[in-house]
């Protein structure tokens, strides 16, 4: 009987266990699959290298504090641990202290030389100073291309313990770069870390030295920090095994014996060719995950020249590592954690057809001219593909009156005309502000079509070049071609046609650009009621008045000057002939020494008068943005859209602006810190007033006198022209002085010289 009861009990227990197991399996099957193909399925970590070191001195209080304020809640603070003479740990980016501190000014005679990994190195080493010695030493920028304005602040060196207690980070990462060096000088990094772990919560420890991990193995217990092996350049030698990092990479199972993760440069995963374009990704992430290793990536910063494939957009770079359809790394080490945070939380796993969270017009400037030569077929097609709402055409006229799209009336700004036989068409036209140029009205349309387009490089002097492989790609577009392309697009809401120099062309060249535009609109099937909205833009009120008289197209008045205010009477004048206004970025957020000083009320006043406001010019290059936008075009767009409330952006990089519309973070009830618009003047409060020169004169106020213009003059009779290919008299403005004779002599000389060289 007792055995029967026991059997029944066992059977009952078995049934219960089966039911519990089935319930667990059912629950697991219903659990949603993580969108993150990381090792754990958790979102990648944002690791702030030295805090917000892209702006503030690395490892300073301000850098760490700002990183916490602007990043995801679980952001990791990174500390490069160095040991002082008295074996205390400080957060400092390098062994030597000259580049990132005021050590040389405080102790000018205490420079020494030591071998570091076998290389003789001179400098002010942390091992020669006690913590007390360093109390008067301040942290400064370590990268000279970054702002020096924060160097004048009091930025004392922080210890590992002070970062932990003052910052209270969600996660704390200690990087040990030179354990072997400290050991040579009788300082034990492992002993310091073990002692520190009793009062400091350490979540990650990394090092590029294999022997270091052998020293600390088992010293932190089962719940100790994650250990991460840091890879340096593949051809560099790991100092304790005398093997290259590339050879260690081929044996990840070996790495797994002492570490739970690896930290690698970006190039280990997405290598670049010699022209800085992406090559196919490696299998490192998948291989490491198979070996049970997390993969963290270093080298992210907004103010460096990244792969051309990203179009100077740091968000695109982050997404290529975490949201590419193949893999995701487990964390990114960044100098600008705000961008890493927004990339992961706001823009990851967002398709191109995702719901728009905000509505504004994305208007191009010469198409996607940041990626291809402006006003070419390729620039316009990419703009449409990238999600532009409105594509634009800056209309120019050839000598035979054909309207076409080009950024400037000066062919030399957008083509390689100066390298062709047409260089003898150069003229000087004071009315157009030139000392000598080859103008569109100096060549026929047939001649212009033979020219090679040239991409714009506004930051050439700093060696920031746009898409060099495609710098001369595409073909120039007539206005007719442009309108036909737009009409056949299902995604565009409109076109913007810019008209300038109309008075000069009528008076001096006998060309009527207003008539040419209106005729082409009619010929290409556009009418006043067409589904594709037509906007006519000009800086001249007289041009827009003329268009208003002859059509019902929407007119847009462009204010070229940077202004601090606009009179109500001027707005009333504008409303008589314009339906919208374009203003410059600095007319919204004035800037001094690359810092935003305030916000004007120009946008608010125009919108109160029912005039939509479009703002130009948005570019992705970090040099185009004040420091308040953290070298991130998305932060800039966010500040103008949600902060200033503008109605549209005029941009050379429409993809970045169009992607912003689908920003998931904009759909949330509360504004998250990494999607908060810049507060005008806030960053300036962190800068010492002595760091600035005397204030410059403020921008002017826009008045009625700036709006009022006489009517457009009538078209004058055009002088007879010479045959194509010869020095053309029609290229010479009556008030200009030609340079044809000199150009012709130079051309002949060049041909004679070339003939002699061929002999």
Swiss-Prot record:
Query: Where would one find the signal peptide in this protein?
Result: 1-27
Record's keyword terms, sorted:
Cell membrane, Cell wall biogenesis/degradation, Glycerol metabolism, Glycoprotein, Hydrolase, Membrane, Repeat, Signal, Transmembrane, Transmembrane helix
Q: Name one GO molecular function term.
A: glycerophosphodiester phosphodiesterase activity
Q: Where are the transmembrane segments?
A: 739-759
Task: State the compartments where it is located.
Answer: Cell membrane
What is any one of the record's Gene Ontology cellular component terms?
cytosol
**Which residue windows does the record flag with biased composition (Polar residues)?**
719-734
- What Enzyme Commission number(s) apply to this enzyme? 3.1.4.46
Residues of this chain annotated as glycosylated in UniProt: 99, 186, 242, 251, 326, 353, 413, 424, 488, 528, 540, 647
Q: Where is this region: Disordered?
A: 702-734
Record protein name field: Glycerophosphodiester phosphodiesterase GDPDL3
């Amino acid at each position: 009987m007792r055995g029967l009861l026991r059997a029944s009990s066992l059977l009952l227990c078995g049934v219960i266990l089966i039911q519990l197991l089935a319930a667990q399996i059912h629950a697991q099957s219903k659990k949603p699959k993580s969108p993150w193909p990381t090792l754990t399925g958790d979102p990648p970590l944002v690791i702030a290298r030295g805090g917000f070191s892209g702006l503030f001195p690395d490892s300073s209080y301000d850098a760490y504090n700002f990183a916490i304020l602007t990043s995801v809640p679980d952001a990791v603070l990174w500390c490069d641990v160095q040991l002082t003479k008295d074996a205390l740990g400080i957060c400092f980016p390098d062994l030597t202290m000259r580049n990132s501190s005021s050590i040389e000014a405080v102790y000018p005679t205490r420079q020494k030389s030591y071998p570091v990994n076998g290389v003789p190195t001179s400098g002010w080493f942390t091992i020669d100073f006690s913590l007390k010695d360093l109390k008067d030493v301040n942290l400064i920028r370590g990268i000279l291309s970054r702002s020096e304005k924060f160097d004048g602040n009091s930025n004392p060196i922080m210890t590992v313990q002070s970062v932990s207690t003052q910052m209270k980070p969600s996660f704390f990462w200690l990087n040990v770069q030179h354990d072997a060096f400290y050991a040579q000088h009788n300082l034990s990094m492992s002993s310091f870390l073990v002692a520190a772990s009793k009062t400091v919560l350490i979540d990650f420890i990394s090092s590029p030295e294999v022997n270091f991990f052998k020293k600390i193995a088992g010293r932190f217990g089962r719940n100790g920090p994650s250990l991460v092996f840091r890879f340096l350049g593949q051809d560099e030698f790991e100092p304790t095994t005398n093997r290259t990092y590339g050879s260690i990479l081929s044996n990840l199972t070996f790495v797994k014996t002492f570490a739970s993760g690896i930290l690698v440069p970006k190039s280990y995963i997405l290598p670049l060719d010699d022209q800085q374009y992406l090559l196919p990704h490696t299998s490192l992430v998948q291989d490491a995950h198979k070996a049970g290793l997390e993969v963290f990536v270093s080298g992210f910063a907004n103010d460096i020249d990244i792969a051309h494939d990203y179009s100077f957009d740091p968000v695109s770079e982050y997404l290529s590592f975490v949201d590419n359809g193949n893999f995701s790394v487990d964390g990114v080490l960044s100098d600008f954690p705000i961008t890493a945070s927004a990339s992961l939380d706001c823009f990851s796993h967002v398709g191109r057809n995702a719901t728009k969270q905000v509505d504004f017009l994305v208007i191009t400037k010469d198409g996607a001219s940041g990626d291809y030569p402006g006003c070419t077929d390729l620039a316009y097609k990419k703009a449409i593909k990238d999600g532009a709402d409105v594509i634009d055409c800056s209309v120019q006229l050839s000598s035979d009156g054909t309207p076409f799209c080009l950024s400037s009336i000066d062919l030399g700004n957008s083509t390689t005309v100066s390298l062709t036989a047409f260089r003898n068409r150069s003229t000087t036209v004071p009315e157009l502000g030139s000392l000598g140029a080859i103008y569109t009205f100096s060549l026929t349309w047939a001649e212009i079509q033979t020219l090679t387009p040239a991409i714009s490089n506004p930051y050439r002097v700093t060696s920031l070049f746009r898409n060099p492989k495609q710098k001369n790609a595409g073909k120039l577009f007539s206005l007719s071609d442009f309108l036909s392309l737009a009409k056949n697009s299902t995604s565009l809401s409109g076109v913007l046609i810019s008209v300038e120099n109309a008075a000069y062309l009528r008076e001096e060249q006998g060309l009527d650009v207003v008539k040419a535009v209106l005729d082409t609109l009619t010929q290409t099937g556009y009418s006043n009621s067409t589904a594709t909205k037509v906007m006519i833009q000009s800086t001249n009120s007289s041009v827009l008045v003329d268009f208003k008289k002859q059509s019902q197209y929407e007119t847009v008045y462009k204010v070229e000057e940077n202004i601090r205010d606009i009179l109500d009477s001027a707005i009333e004048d504008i409303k008589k002939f314009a339906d919208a206004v374009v203003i410059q970025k600095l007319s919204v957020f004035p800037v001094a020494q690359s810092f935003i000083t305030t916000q004007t009320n120009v946008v608010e006043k125009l919108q109160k008068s029912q005039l939509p406001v479009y703002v130009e010019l948005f570019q992705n290059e970090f040099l185009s943005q004040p420091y308040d936008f953290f070298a991130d075009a998305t932060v800039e767009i966010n500040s103008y859209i949600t902060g200033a409330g503008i109605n549209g952006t005029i941009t050379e990089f429409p993809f970045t602006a169009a992607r912003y519309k689908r920003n998931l973070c904009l759909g949330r009830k509360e504004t998250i810190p990494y999607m908060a618009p810049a507060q005008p003047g806030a960053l300036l409060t962190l800068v010492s007033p002595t760091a600035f020169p005397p204030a410059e004169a403020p921008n002017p106020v826009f008045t009625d006198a700036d709006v009022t213009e006489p009517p457009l003059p009538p078209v004058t009779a055009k002088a007879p022209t010479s045959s194509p290919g010869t020095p053309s008299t029609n290229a010479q403005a009556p008030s200009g002085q030609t340079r044809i004779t000199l150009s012709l002599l130079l051309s002949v000389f060049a041909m004679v010289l070339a003939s002699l060289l061929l002999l």
